[in-house]
Amino acid sequence: MKRVFSLMTGWSTRKPWLVLGIIALLTAVAVAGALRIQMEFSQEALLPDKYPSIATLRKVEEDFGGLNYAKVLLTGSDLLSPEAALVLFQYQEALQGGAGSAEWEDLVLRVESYLSFLLRNPQARALMSLYSSLRTSGSGEEAMAAVREFLVSEEARSMEGEPEAAPFLQGLRIAAEQGEAGAGKAEYLVEAAVSEALHRYLESVGAMVLGRTVTADGKAAVVNIQVRPDLPQAEVLRRAGKLEDFTVDFFASRGLAAEVSGEVYMMKALQHLSLRDSAVLGIIALFFIALVLFLTFRKVLDIFLTLAVVFVSLLWIFGIMGFAGIRYTVMGMALIPLMLGIDIAYSIHVLTRYYEERDKRKGAEDSAVSSVVTVGIAVFLAAATTIFGFLSFSISDLPPIRQFGFLCLGGVLFGFLLSITMLPAALVIRDRRRGVRETRRVEEHLLLDWLDRGLARLSLLAERHRLPVWIGCLVLVVACGLSVLGISTSADFRTFVPQDLPSYRSFTRIEEYFGGQDTTVALLEGEDLLSPPSLRKMDEFVSAVLDHPRNLTPEGERKYFRPEKTNSLPGIFRALKALSSAEAAGANPAGEAVQEAEPGDWVPVSREEAEVLLSRAEEAFGFESTSLLTPDGKSSLVAFEVPFVNEEGEKEMAFILRDAASAVSATGTFDIRLTGMPLIISDALDKLFTTQLESGGLALLLCALLVMVVFRSMAYGLTATSVVFLAILLEVGLLRLIGWPLDIMTVMIASLVIGAGIDFGIHVAHRFREELYENRLGPEEAVNATVRNVGTALISAAVTTSGAFLILAISSFSPLRRFGVITALALASACFAALVLEPTFLTTVATRLDRRVRAGGKGSED
């Protein structure tokens, strides 16, 4: 291995300009790839398509347009007035169906408001259109032209047979005969007709809109805009930004206040914050590491060279992201501080040893080669074990974690290769004309020299009092190990969004006005879903969900799923039955009438009758059957609007749905597949803890085996690995102590700490063996020499790495803050254990091996 390093570094130092030229060319290509990076912030991107909740979501998107909605909250003095209804009508027309709506057709699939049912009636739509024309006409002549056009329309002729419409139509004809002078009268008549239509509409279907899309007092209303599922998220967010500007300006100019929210706007806010945080965190990490490097080497050019290694490796990572189509996510925000912290350590170790060799009055080329050959094995082991740590992410089922591990793996590999090629080449170009006059700057640093001596004393103190140190360590291990039982999990991407953001506050306000706004659906698939048995089973499923014991409070109230927030075919047929009963009795069908229908008397007697009743429902309620039933009748949706709750609530909702679906599906009438945020989050939560165990265990095993093979000693391999084992347990203990959950970010800490933290243990073990077996020092002297020679480099690497992660604590995202703080503390503890605890293990191992050799037994050394 030393020969390989010698050849690579030797060639780099002999042809430094060629090496730098090749690296510059590769970097230019990487920049081209980096420009192709796209961003992705969505909950479903967390899981692979093979998961049931995601596979079902894709089917719902294909058949029904998906579950992604932008929401507009409107507030005003009276949103049920004709004037406010007109503004809402004009807005819906602007987005879908009217002049200028083509601008939004690639984004908007469907627009729903409290007016939607009314506007599906041709006569009502024609009346609203006439009202809009009269209010926006530029002259009396233009207004009367609109009136005359309406009077000869098919909709006006269909109103002729309605006695209550006769006075209205007669008044319009008189106004039309008066010409421009009749414009005012026409507008008055139309406004009165719209007011009457709204009143009758709310009386007939009030239970379907009041409290759901408009408050009973008319002070607030919500517009649900279904977003097309086939657009890339980057395009969705771009167009959503334009829609937000248009919406706010549209309503503000008409005297209404509008706020936008929904998942699309939360993800948009997440993207904006992530870009801002990436820049801020990267700059702060850069200045912090530059300061640490300056205190270590006290040379501006040294700072530039070590940072150049990291910057080039980062550019190569982003180039791979662009060419491989890997999207930038919230997890990507940790890439820059992470690589700054890890890759800089390799350069620090090489540069520190370079000055050590220069202090021996060697030339630049010889010093560069010697520095890599001597410290190269330790740096290689550090890089290889870190790579194994990130390689363990490949077994995760969660795509973002796999991709993050792949990128970090590449970054570590690039950082190592550049440290033994680019850095030596640059050092030779800088120093070869200086001969052998260079001195080792680290030795001249009094503070660092004091630190070296202090660390050596602390290590020797621990070595001389092994038993108390080991007992204390054992107590800590047991305490932290037991704490794993109390760790919670979190997988909701919406918790990434700071609660003071406008989109989050607006979403909360919408829920305060109208209840739950998250849509969770059951996709029912069967041969004949309109048959009476299927409809009864469908209703049985809805009842099983609504009346599930875990959906009920001790007082009998429903916690998550409510009948008034449930949309299904049985619900439509029940409402239609109530309407028919009310009409027969000569009364208005209030919302309570739906509940008064006898069980089962709402069920159509045949599929043919069901189809007829659905057509009638479309006329009576403005109900759009394709929103709940596919044209072939083989797939239907049951949609529940549920509140935004914590992960425990999401898990409970998922359990209720699965339990009810399991009971009904067992009959074989149809299959029930479930999706929506509770199901997606539940699937993700199930994987977080197993991901931690599987990836962490694999990383620890691979790293331990590699160190054992390279050291050719199980004892030394386990000793070097012990520091990360302790750091992982400390991580678990800290999570439990602080009360932080295991989430999409913190789940990666174990493997990361294993991969990056084992570097400290490797460098100490490698240098100890060098002092013990090559320099022939005794165990205590070897500990002293080891800590004094590598202590500064390890502390510098630990400060830069831990500091880079600690900088994440100022992020806007709480999961990223938790990730940064816990990782920083775990890595710092790994460094401390390597310098203080590991020497006690090393001297014990060395003493026992020496006794075996003296006794004539076979040692395990080289």
Go through each PLM region and give its residues.
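Interfacial helix-loop-helix hairpins and adjacent transmembrane helices
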Residues: M1-A24, V369, L417-V477, Y773, ...
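Transmembrane helices with small-residue packing motifs
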Residues: V19-I54, F64, L74, I395, ...
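Extracytoplasmic
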Residues: A55, E103-V300, F311, T553-A704, ...
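Interfacial segments of transmembrane alpha-helices in multi-pass membrane proteins
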Residues: Q271-Y328, I395-P399, E694-W740, I810-S814
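Pore- and gate-forming transmembrane helices of large, multi-pass membrane proteins
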Residues: S278-V280, L307, Y346, D359-S396, ...
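Hydrophobic, glycine/alanine-rich multi-pass transmembrane helices and their short helix-loop junctions
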Residues: V292, M321, F380-L423, A704-M708, ...
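Hydrophobic alpha-helical segments
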Residues: I317-V436, A809-S811, A826
